[in-house]
Amino acid sequence: MNNKILEQLEFNKVKELLLPYLKTEQSQEELLELEPMTEASKIEKSFNEISDMEQIFVEHHSFGIVSLSSISESLKRLELSADLNIQELLAIKKVLQSSSDMIHFYSDLDNVSFQSLDRLFENLEQFPNLQGSFQAINDGGFLEHFASPELERIRRQLTNSERRVRQILQDMLKEKAELLSENLIASRSGRSVLPVKNTYRNRISGVVHDISSSGSTVYIEPRAVVTLNEEITQLRADERHEEGRILHAFSDLLRPHVATIRNNAWILGHLDFVRAKYLFMSDNKATIPKISNDSTLALINVRHPLLSNPVANDLHFDHDLTAIVITGPNTGGKTIMLKTLGLAQLMGQSGLPVLADKGSKIAVFNNIFADIGDEQSIEQSLSTFSSHMTHIVSILNEADHNSLVLFDELGAGTDPQEGASLAMAILEHLRLSHIKTMATTHYPELKAYGIETNFVENASMEFDAETLSPTYRFMQGVPGRSNAFEIASRLGLAPFIVKQAKQMTDSDSDVNRIIEQLEAQTLETRRRLDHIKEVEQENLKFNRAVKKLYNEFSHERDKELEKIYQEAQEIVDMALNESDTILKKLNDKSQLKPHEIIDAKAQIKKLAPQVDLSKNKVLNKAKKIKAARAPRIGDDIIVTSYGQRGTLTSQLKDGRWEAQVGIIKMTLTHDEFTLVRVQEEQKVKNKQINVVKKADSSGPRARLDLRGKRYEEAMQELDHFIDQALLNNMGQVDIIHGIGTGVIREGVTKYLRRHKHVKHFAYAPQNAGGSGATIVTLG
């Protein structure tokens, strides 16, 4: 399609209306490149995507997508074997996380039936291993300590050295206060210094790094911290080097996946663009038009998108209709109507909602041409008429039966009689070529052409004779008429002059009366249609209200089910806590062994009645709610014992999970981690923040280290450890005894062999300690 029409109708300004709805740079780039399409299938696909998005908002009320920066240049740099900086890696991390969120969102969707968006969601890929590694980059664009063991070591040393320097300088601040111009530790060239009065500069030995502008203060690095500061400088250099190495490693991790990540980024941007189209449609009461296959146009209550308070009009351009000629005086809105048609077509063919009512229909044109406004070329010294005619000649040479042509004031700028004849000849040529045309004119001769010629229809813009102002209402089928006599009378022209003028135009009076009658009939028809539309709107509101009530009822029902489940869980927890309290009191007041308490606890559990709840519909529904929170590949987690964030990468056959935590892979059971998403939901509900930082050292340990212990001490600790593990229902524990002389190892083996609650034990794998550690299964 020719680009000139986009400029003439200010299509770029229409595209700017969607900018506030976009969240990603990728979608902004897509909007910038948006142009009208000429294939009906592609347009239909765009409309189907908006319909799918509408389903999401109707059923789920939102479609969350985070702000994402463009990563296209970063991916190109990766393809050129370049390493990315921390900000580029952070942008890619957000794309990976957003991809995972979208996959989970799609898997949780209910009550929707997509036509197009399902393919987009299904083409998204997630990278749990990469996501786990990228947990080492926080949202502030900073590498966490656990990014690598070396980085953690360097930063720990750096912190210790800086603390020692501060302590030494703090002591000197107290001891040498009278020698200092300020009681503070300053920094010069990255080294910690003291601000010493110039008169006492020889009282503190060290390196002078700076002098104040007045010369009264000398910034000295005391000799006591010179070595430490040099160590800090070296550690900072080591830190930068290690960070660079880590960034290089991250870049290498990404390189094999560039194409897939690029596709993910495009899909996320496109989903954001579709979301913006829907929100634009919703806010502006626009609609998704139907696509005709026979060049039929039907725009119901169509509005100009760039006007603040546009008047809605109906426009019908049937298949057989070739031309619509809008006649009547200037300033009535003829040009606006012309542009409204053109913009509605451009928006529709670009896959955008059209500012019209439901039931509207657009055609698909290969080209749209327009001659609108004064396009006189000053450089070529062309007159207005010559400029327009040059443009019209170009249009007639290029237009075909798949084109739409728009003419504003066709034939203007020359002798009225010749101009009218030219206008009719041009329209006749286009009619015979089956080219759809809309033209405005103020020549009365074209009214007769519209009445007498097949497949050509007159139209006009309504004028209010009472207020002497245009209403901007489009009246299709009614030719325009002059309102000169009415206006002159209302403005005070003598009645006899007006009467004489009417007598001079007797030949036209009958035509004007017919036009007046047509206008009255059109207004009556419009009033009836408006009433019908009001009834339709009331019905639509009623249907929406019913659907809203149903959704609210479903939501409240689900809340009640959740509440019932929580109350049942609380009852069970209270009973278990009460039994634990009883056992604790027994333990405190008697000489019972811990394993005897375990036996007693098992007997208490046997006392609980076994109730068959398999047919309980309420609890079954509650179980489904709980099951919805089961972990999935790609979920972000917190490893409870370490307080570290990671990502689930796969599930083993025995039910355990593999997780990527920084650069480390871990194997975890379900109770050794918590889902970040679930934690965040609980934080919102409880209005408090509980972040696991470190396992409580006073609680039961899953690992016992006996290295360096005496035999008797080791056996006592082992006995206590096993009892505590059994009390806390631990299924598996690790005992580290080392190899050494083998005395403690043999003692551990004998103890485990005779303990009735030890189901199985064996040495650890070679990569986990070998014969220096024993893995024990309890039961």
UniProtKB/Swiss-Prot annotation:
Residues noted as binding ATP in the record, renumbered to the chain: 328-335
Keywords assigned by UniProt, alphabetized: ATP-binding, DNA-binding, Endonuclease, Hydrolase, Nuclease, Nucleotide-binding, RNA-binding, rRNA-binding
Broad EC category: hydrolase
Annotated GO MF terms: ATP binding; ATP hydrolysis activity; ATP-dependent DNA damage sensor activity; endonuclease activity; mismatched DNA binding; ribosomal large subunit binding; rRNA binding
EC number(s) given by UniProt: 3.1.-.-, 3.6.4.-
Smr domain residues: 704-779
Entry similarity comment: Belongs to the DNA mismatch repair MutS family. MutS2 subfamily.
Subunit note: Homodimer. Binds to stalled ribosomes, contacting rRNA.
Record's protein name: Endonuclease MutS2
Species of provenance: Streptococcus pyogenes serotype M5 (strain Manfredo)
